[in-house]
Curated annotation (Swiss-Prot):
The record marks T45, Y109 as: Part of a proton relay during catalysis. It comes from Aliarcobacter butzleri (strain RM4018). One of its GO terms (molecular function) is 4-hydroxy-tetrahydrodipicolinate synthase activity. The active site is at Y135 (proton donor/acceptor), K164 (schiff-base intermediate with substrate). Homotetramer; dimer of dimers. It is found in: Cytoplasm. This is 4-hydroxy-tetrahydrodipicolinate synthase. One of its GO terms (cellular component) is cytosol. GO terms for biological process: diaminopimelate biosynthetic process; lysine biosynthetic process via diaminopimelate. It holds the Pfam family DHDPS. Pathway: Amino-acid biosynthesis; L-lysine biosynthesis via DAP pathway; (S)-tetrahydrodipicolinate from L-aspartate: step 3/4.
Amino acid sequence: MDIITGSMTALITPFKNGKVDLQKYESLIKRQIAQGINAVSPVGTTGESATLSHKEHKECIEVAVATCKNSGVKVLAGAGSNATHEACDIAKFAQEVGADGILSIAPYYNKPTQEGLYQHYKAIANSVELPLMLYNVPGRTGVDLLPETAIRLFDDVKNIYGIKEATGSLERATSLMSARKDFVVVSGDDSVDFPMLASGARGIISVTSNLLPNLKSKLVSSVLEGDYKTSLSIHNDLYELNKTLFCESNPIPIKAAMYLSGLLDSLEFRLPLTNPSAETMQKLEKILIKYEVIK
């Protein structure tokens, strides 16, 4: 099984006049490819998947696959839903169009038991042959995929290979990695990327890399090559930016930052997400000037 690790970007989804701007989406992915990212992950939390139709969800995956074809950059397609059959449908589509793997968030709102989470993920993984990465972010889903459940899935289901751990807990990450040496953990929280990597994580799925893919790629490649000093320096340098990019609910600040830096032509969200406050826009402009992203 060809697993997906390294520097990965949780792609934003651009809108134009209320519709997904697939042309802009393609150009954003091409920029990721040019700046050294290892993989892109379309239609996850940062991609506003919860407010996309199934048709739009699939269109984004298809564009990502087509854009990354023959580039060496892999596509870890978002295939999460709180309805298991819907997640299976998206996963099957991703496989059909040529995605390299599946990233599936824990089902939100339903609050399933650990057995329910186990059966949910087992069903998705068994519906495809692609490698599947679990995704745990209890602060957004209302349910915590516990380490023992994640390891049970890894042991029982051949194509489940790891987890995007977005609790920000180094203890949680260490407990997972110590349980099974081959179980892949990647950081899902920009604020702890270096500590996670230094502790044995095999990569990151980053929000900040939408804006600075070259630096986030360098952060990961450096530590994986044993150059901890360079990686730590980049991580610490990005601290203030990372903090500002999460001053409101993700992906509001990152899309605003991309708009201010000229990467997006319009700043649009779908309700219930709204544009950032004037105060946040001022914070973002100030930090982007400081980091020389804009003048």
